[in-house]
């Protein structure tokens, strides 16, 4: 289905695209970053925060660790400080890249089991599918942020995968 090489490529793409969005958002005021723009998570900042949290959640599952303490609701407002967010985003990018660097093709086989926040239902899915969800989820929400930034007059970089420098 997918390979460790695919994961390393997508991790690099993730880092590049996150840097593009953060750089573009740097040109906005804090008020502009938190402005409700009618998107699913309302604002640029809330959507970026959600993505930061979800990366931690999915990585924790893939590593066999406990879920992050923050809930999805909390993920929309924290971190609230832009400088803090930027530092944390860089760390999370590094975490994703380090995870993928250690990954072997065999690590993508088998099933992943977890319980959602309320602990009510056992979920079991193919591990490769969960890894694909990590990257698909990132792309989905970054597309929303890209659209909001563009509408706000900012200029994020192109998103085409073939534009990623080797």
Describe the predicted segments one by one.
Residues 1-8:
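Basic/polar N-terminal segments that are highly enriched at the extreme N-terminus
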Residues 8-75, 117-166:
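Short, contiguous alpha-helical
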Residues 8, 59, 83-86, 109:
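Generic detector of well-ordered alpha-helical segments enriched in charged/polar residues
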Residues 66-106:
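Helix-adjacent hinge/juxtasegments
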């Amino acid at each position: 289905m997918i390979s460790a090489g695919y994961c390393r490529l997508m991790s690099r793409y993730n880092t590049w695209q996150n840097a593009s969005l953060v750089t573009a958002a740097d040109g906005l005021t804090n008020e502009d970053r938190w402005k409700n723009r009618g998107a699913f998570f309302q604002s640029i900042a809330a959507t970026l925060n959600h993505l930061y949290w979800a990366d931690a959640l999915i990585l924790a599952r893939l590593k066999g660790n406990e879920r992050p303490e923050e809930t999805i609701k909390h993920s929309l407002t924290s971190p609230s400080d832009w400088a803090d967010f930027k530092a944390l985003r860089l760390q999370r990018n590094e975490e994703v890249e380090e995870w993928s660097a250690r990954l072997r093709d065999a690590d993508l086989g088998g099933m992943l089991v977890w319980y959602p926040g309320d602990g009510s239902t056992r979920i079991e899915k193919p591990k490769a599918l969960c890894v694909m969800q990590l990257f698909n989820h990132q792309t989905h929400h970054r597309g929303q942020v890209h659209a909001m930034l563009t509408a706000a007059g900012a200029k994020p970089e192109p998103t085409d995968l073939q534009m990623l420098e080797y």
